[in-house]
């Protein structure tokens, strides 16, 4: 079993819940993909990093991250996987709002000004979270070269309409829901 297949099995085993769920978009779903159960799992997180690095291998970027909280463990997994390959990248966290104390930053981590960055999300239904991060990154002077997610729940066209490449490791139908 390769990394992509092993990660998919892990998502199916640990990341899919059934019931009535309200998504961050306000929409309702009978199944919920809770990828924090995957991206924060000690066995599966390294797979997340390796699989996303492979999926985005045709893009050139030197930092990854997105809107807190879904993107945070994804960025950390990619940071560690890249370092293990000998090709380090930086990670950053985009806050939902600028801090009102301390350094009053919206984007935490290494400065993204003038850097080629990849915006991340664990799963995306409408694209709102990742596009909020994209807007903050552009406002900070970053060059956003694309968006990558583990599971696409329907955000692809909205991201593409913004002129950004969109990489999804899995489509919803691959999860069997």
Predicted region positions:
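Short glycine-rich phosphate-binding loop at a beta-alpha junction
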Residues: 59-70, 148-149
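Conserved acidic residues
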Residues: 62, 115, 145
